[in-house]
């Protein structure tokens, strides 16, 4: 699948994002690479293969969890087209 301007515009509208004109070609190229990779994965013959949740024997490796101060919410929200408090504000699409 090739990502063209029409599809990119549709994705912009659905995601409520605005892609700058100087980044459009780069984004189209990156999205095309992602779709091509998924197409390659779809070609794999997995008949008879059992689903694997984790390849690590003995469970998941754990790390120590320690709280740290972060301003990640403010960084993310400054890119939002609309926000209410510390949340994204999106248009209602379902009645």
Swiss-Prot record:
Pfam families the UniProt entry points to: GatC
Family classification: Belongs to the GatC family.
UniProt GO BP: glutaminyl-tRNAGln biosynthesis via transamidation; regulation of translational fidelity; translation
SUPFAM superfamilies in alphabetical order: Glu-tRNAGln amidotransferase C subunit (SSF141000)
Record function comment: Allows the formation of correctly charged Asn-tRNA(Asn) or Gln-tRNA(Gln) through the transamidation of misacylated Asp-tRNA(Asn) or Glu-tRNA(Gln) in organisms which lack either or both of asparaginyl-tRNA or glutaminyl-tRNA synthetases. The reaction takes place in the presence of glutamine and ATP through an activated phospho-Asp-tRNA(Asn) or phospho-Glu-tRNA(Gln).
Keywords: ATP-binding, Ligase, Nucleotide-binding, Protein biosynthesis
GO molecular function, one term: ATP binding
EC number, as in UniProt: 6.3.5.-
Protein name listed in UniProt: Aspartyl/glutamyl-tRNA(Asn/Gln) amidotransferase subunit C
InterPro entries, per database record: Asp/Glu-ADT_sf_sub_c, GatC
Alphabetized Gene3D superfamilies for the sequence: Glu-tRNAGln amidotransferase C subunit, N-terminal domain (1.10.20.60)
Organism: Campylobacter curvus (strain 525.92)
Coiled coil: none
Catalytic activity line of the entry: L-glutamyl-tRNA(Gln) + L-glutamine + ATP + H2O = L-glutaminyl-tRNA(Gln) + L-glutamate + ADP + phosphate + H(+); L-aspartyl-tRNA(Asn) + L-glutamine + ATP + H2O = L-asparaginyl-tRNA(Asn) + L-glutamate + ADP + phosphate + 2 H(+)
Listed HAMAP family: GatC
Record text on subunit structure and interactions: Heterotrimer of A, B and C subunits.
């Amino acid at each position: 699948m090739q990502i063209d301007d029409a599809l990119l515009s549709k994705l912009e509208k659905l995601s409520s994002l605005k892609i700058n004109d100087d980044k459009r070609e780069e984004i189209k190229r990156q999205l095309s690479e992602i779709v091509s990779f998924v197409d390659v994965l779809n070609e794999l013959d997995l008949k008879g293969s059992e689903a694997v949740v984790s390849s690590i024997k003995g469970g998941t490796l754990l790390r120590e969890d320690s709280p740290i101060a972060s301003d990640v919410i403010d960084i993310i929200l400054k890119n939002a087209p609309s926000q209410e408090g510390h949340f994204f504000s999106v248009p209602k699409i379902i009645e």
